[in-house]
């Protein structure tokens, strides 16, 4: 919700303070048509990754059908933000594997690796390196050591946009 606020959507700080409160614009799971800037309702953890992969596939299909040498109409990047709990779900793993297989270079996944899930530390249910898992899926993987380094994040996003061979995974 912070990103939506900073991007200028109608999401004032008062709404952010009402996070997870009944009738707020900031429910526990983002909801399409309830929160400005939310393009789909992701529902259970991991589903947002599947939604993003679907959007990236749709973008590729639209580009193949409508783009010409004179007019590149569809050239957008799909960006998904995911946490530890999201990437522990099977739907996220399956969708990410497909994204790597299809070399969806219009997809960037930003992973907030704070080692916290909804009700426990991530190591209570996960022991593998998520970074290495996404490398195995075929992603271009970038590690940002300091999540407060905005220039490093901007540089990683620019690198993701510039490469045209595979999806990008940015661990923050």
Where are the model-predicted features located?
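A short alpha/beta connector and helix-capping loop motif
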Residues: 89-112, 169-171
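Cofactor-binding active-site loop characterized by glycine-rich and histidine/acidic residues
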Residues: 1-101
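Conserved thiamine diphosphate
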Residues: 67-74, 115-117, 121-159
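Short glycine-/polar-rich loops that comprise or flank the Walker A/P-loop
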Residues: 76, 104-107, 137
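Anion (oxyanion) recognition and catalysis
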Residues: 101-103, 135, 164
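Terminal amphipathic helices with adjacent charged low-complexity linkers/tails
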Residues: 161, 167-172
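Cofactor-binding loop segments of dinucleotide-utilizing enzymes, especially the Rossmann-like FAD-
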Residues: 83, 111-114
């Amino acid at each position: 919700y912070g990103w939506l606020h900073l991007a200028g959507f109608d999401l004032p700080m008062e709404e952010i303070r009402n996070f997870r409160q009944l009738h707020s614009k900031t429910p526990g799971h983002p909801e399409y048509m309830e929160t400005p800037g939310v393009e789909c309702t992701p529902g259970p953890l991991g589903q947002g990754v599947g939604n993003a992969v679907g959007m990236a596939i749709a973008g590729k299909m639209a580009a193949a059908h409508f783009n010409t040498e004179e007019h590149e109409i569809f050239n957008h990047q799909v960006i998904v933000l995911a946490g530890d709990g999201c990437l522990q779900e099977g739907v996220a793993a399956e969708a990410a594997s497909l994204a790597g297989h299809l070399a969806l270079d219009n997809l960037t996944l930003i992973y907030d690796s704070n080692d916290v899930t909804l009700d426990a530390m991530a190591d209570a249910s996960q022991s593998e390196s998520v970074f290495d898992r996404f490398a195995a899926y075929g992603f271009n993987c970038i590690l940002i050591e300091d999540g407060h380094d905005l220039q490093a994040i901007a540089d990683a996003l620019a690198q993701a946009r510039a490469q045209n061979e595979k999806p990008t995974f940015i661990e923050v």
